[in-house]
Amino acid sequence: MTNMTLRKHVIYFLFFISCSLSKPSDASRGGIAIYWGQNGNEGNLSATCATGRYAYVNVAFLVKFGNGQTPELNLAGHCNPAANTCTHFGSQVKDCQSRGIKVMLSLGGGIGNYSIGSREDAKVIADYLWNNFLGGKSSSRPLGDAVLDGIDFNIELGSPQHWDDLARTLSKFSHRGRKIYLTGAPQCPFPDRLMGSALNTKRFDYVWIQFYNNPPCSYSSGNTQNLFDSWNKWTTSIAAQKFFLGLPAAPEAAGSGYIPPDVLTSQILPTLKKSRKYGGVMLWSKFWDDKNGYSSSILASV
């Protein structure tokens, strides 16, 4: 091999190494999850997904279920499930999925009447969710024939009993040919008082921790350490594929925990993205994101 040929090989090798070092790691890339459904002025599902800013959409909320109650979907001003006017969102769910966006049905929320009375009750609820929102069959599917990607646990009321049974039962449906994603939105104090047992089942794919309305474990007045300590506790204690930093999309969206976009992108995300379990950012909610433009401000850094 001539000296000139050797020099060319060395140059190509160094160029390859420099490109490899400068390329962002796939592990550090994240997506944005958004809650949609609780304000009729936030646009429809198709418009939400067409923004190109979101990788996950949680349709919120199924507010009533369990203990023999007739399940009730509440989509605020978007439609009236009781009058069967929400079925047109089925085509919009499919539109989102065609863009590679995962769409989940979110259970619970801060207002509602939900609980699980027993292991048998958990199975009844799981069967209802399978037949009405997932891959099963029912004549009364609230969102039409769309097959959602999974179920989100946003449990903020009631008893901690049997949410683990529901998670285990739902996960079994994945064996029917299509993956059923399980996601959860616990409060940042660890362990979550209502969802702790469910999250310990190791059945959850994504966990978007609510780092707001809980000052001891969220950002406040330039203090990032409480948030970092809580993040580390969650990511080292719970066996989930990915964890997300859950935030209010505007100061008015929560009582505390709002992080200015420049602080998030410069002081917080660079640290969180070092975690191999980092998945991205979750925002509450689409309505507040529209008002404040938060996702647009942070998207390139997520």
Swiss-Prot record:
CDD domains: GH18_hevamine_XipI_class_III (cd02877). Residues 1-30 form the signal peptide. It catalyses: Random endo-hydrolysis of N-acetyl-beta-D-glucosaminide (1->4)-beta-linkages in chitin and chitodextrins. This is Acidic endochitinase. The active site is at E156 (proton donor). Its EC number is 3.2.1.14. The keyword Signal applies. Residues 31-302 form the GH18 domain. One of its GO terms (molecular function) is endochitinase activity. PROSITE patterns: GH18_1, GH18_2. Keywords: Carbohydrate metabolism, Chitin degradation, Disulfide bond, Glycosidase, Hydrolase, Polysaccharide degradation, Secreted, Signal. One of its GO terms (cellular component) is extracellular region. The lineage of its organism: Eukaryota, Viridiplantae, Streptophyta, Embryophyta, Tracheophyta. Changing S22T: In strain: cv. Ci-0. Gene3D superfamilies: Glycosidases (3.20.20.80).
